[in-house]
Amino acid sequence: MGNAGQAKFYLQQAAKINPENEQITLALGKAHFATGDFQNSLNCFLTLQKKTFDDIDINYHIAMSYGRLNQQGESHYYFGLYFKNEKKKESALFHFRKALDYFPKGSVRAVAISDAIHELSADKPKKPDKKSDGQQNISR
């Protein structure tokens, strides 16, 4: 296993030379996380999200960083986004529901969470339809 502190040093140098390089920023965020510098880790990952970095794992890294910073509401929210992108509805719903406990009702974040819950819940009725189709086929 490599030395995360040394990697962080070299990645910081590379980031100074090429601050727009998303791969460097991602690697630097991971190095910050590995060395326990969770705030700078979070800052790197949020920068990538704002640049619409095309990596669904970014929500996972953001969630982990918020968790290490003991910001449970944000952590659950980003885990919800991660699992939603992974098409794991039950895990996404679990985290979104947990996140709601940390935000005031009517706040921008609470509304976004509620919208995500409703969107995921709206997909649920598709399962019973498949079962009823299967039952009709069995009885034939």
PLM ranges: what are they?
Residues 85-140:
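Terminal, low-structured helical/coil segments at or just beyond the last alpha-helical repeat
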Residues 27-28, 61, 78, 95, ...:
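Canonical tetratricopeptide repeat
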